[in-house]
Amino acid sequence: MSNAPFFTEAWQQMPDEERENYHRAVFMNMEGHYALQKRVEYFRGIMRHVGEGVFIGCGVRIVNPQFVSLGDRVQIHDRCTLMASTERGITLEAGARLKHGVYLDTEGGADGCIQIGRRVYVGTGCCLHGHSGLEIGDDSLLAQNVTITPFSHTFDDPARTIYSQGGRQRKVTIGRDCYLGMNVSVLWSADIGDGAVVGAGSVVVKPIPPLSVAVGVPARVIRKREGLSPAPTTPE
């Protein structure tokens, strides 16, 4: 037996706000050009800024969209999560790409923010935090499952829980034209200079100078890249 008559009657009796929520839930998780248009239209009305030519995939979750800015041609693929917990929020500059399942979280605190530069590629499953700020320079590449955490728990007092002891945090900067391989972890004590390369699976605990190649746990510089400066910025 068809449920169509029951559904039609229920739909007609549904308050306008509930109908709107239903439509939103459908197009947020639908594929196709129409659903994409509706998602972008919806987020453009509630975000700080949405540029032209933006792509927002299925199942994208954005918390506090009023603190999120997307430049022209930004791509946010399926199942990404953006947690803009602070007013400084999250900025994706023109041409930045987040692949499937990327997680961004500014965390708490007034200084929390994430700024991702032009044409930056963030691979599937990356997890990036911005406790005291995270900045990634133009044209950098992050392979799958890279983790960047500008925070470290304090655990000096064994009589107290680790959680209750708080921790240390600072702004972390990834320079322009960097390449971080798969499963790289960048800890709170490390910055990465322009043009540096970090090999897959490395754990970065100290600053990496510009144009260096670093590998290992902990990551150590094994050589310098040829050339005197990072590649020039790619034209728009």
Give residue ranges: language-model regions.
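Basic, gly/Ser/Thr/Pro-rich low-complexity segments located predominantly at protein N termini
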Residues: V186, V204-K206, V221
